[in-house]
Amino acid sequence: MQPSPPADRPFDVLGIGAASIDFVHVLPGRIALNVPSPTKRRIDRRLVLCGGQVATTLATSVSFGLRATFAGAIGNDENGARVRRELVSRGVDVTDAIVCDAPNQYAIILVDERSGERTILWDRHPGLALGERDLRPGALAAARIVHVDDVDVDAAIRAATLARAVGAVVTTDIDEVTGRTMELVSASTFPIFAEHVPSAITGIDEPGDALRALRRTHPGVLCATLGARGAIALDGSELVQSPAFVVEAVDTTGAGDVFRGGFIYGYLQGWSTARTLRFANAAAALSCTRFGAMASVPFRDEVERLLQLG
C-alpha cells in the first residue's frame, strides 16, 4: 500500500457521512420482506443504539487507539443529540460536526435471531445534505485520513477531492451504485466496496475479476468486503484474499463499518495489505458477536487475541 500521510496532523482520521440512531428489532426465525401476503411477526427484543457507517468506523478507529473526528451532519433533534453524546463518550471529537435544521438519520434494523443476518430500513432527511461551505479545507487538512460514505454522495465527492488536494488519504464506504459512484471511486485513494458493488458496476460476477476490471479506472488498492467470505483487495496486480473468521454471530449490523476501521488502523501502521485485511476481518467478526453497530465495536486487544487463536 502507499506511504502514510504526514504523522504530525492533529487527527488520524476525519469522517463525513452517516451517524444514525438505530432501532434494532430481534425477530425469531428468518426475515422475509418479500412475503406474498400480509404477515405478523413478534419482536423478541428491541434495542435503541447508535450507528451509521462513518460514525461506527470512527468509533472503531478510536477503540484501536487512533485519534478521530466527525465532521458530518447531525440532526438538531434528540436523536441527533444522542448520537453526538455517543460519539463524544467514545472519544470521537465532534468540534466540526454540522448540526442541521433537520431530524437525524435513523434506521429500523430487523435481526434474524438464528443467523444474526439483518435487514436495514433507513431514512435520511434532505436537510442533512452538506453544502460546499460545510466542507472546510482546513478541517480536512487536520487529518491524515478522510473517510467518507455515499449517503450524501455529492458531499463525499467534494470532501474526497478537497482532502486529496491537502495531502490526506481518502478511504470510502461505497454501498450503492448511482450515476456518481465512479466519480467517488476516482476521488478516493482506497475505495472499499460493499460486496455487491464491484459486480454491479462492471457486470462481472466474480469479485476478483470485477476488481481487475475496475483497475482500468483506478490505479490504487481496490478492496471489497465479502460478508461471511471475508474480504479481497487488488494491490497492484496481486489479488489478496482474506477469509472471514468463524464466530457465533448474533447481529451483523456494522460489521463492514468495523472492517473499515480495522483497515484504516492497519494502513496507518504500515502493514501489508494481507495483514491489514486479516486484522480488519477479525475486528468485523468480533463485532458480529454483539448487537448493534457502535455497541459492537471491539477493542484492539480482543482483535489480537482472536488473531492469535486463528
Q: Which residues make up each language-model segment?
A:
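Glycine-rich phosphate/adenosyl-contacting loop at the front of the ribokinase-like
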Residues: M1-A71, E248-A249
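Gly/Ala-rich phosphate-binding loop of Rossmann-like dinucleotide-binding domains
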Residues: V62, R164, L268
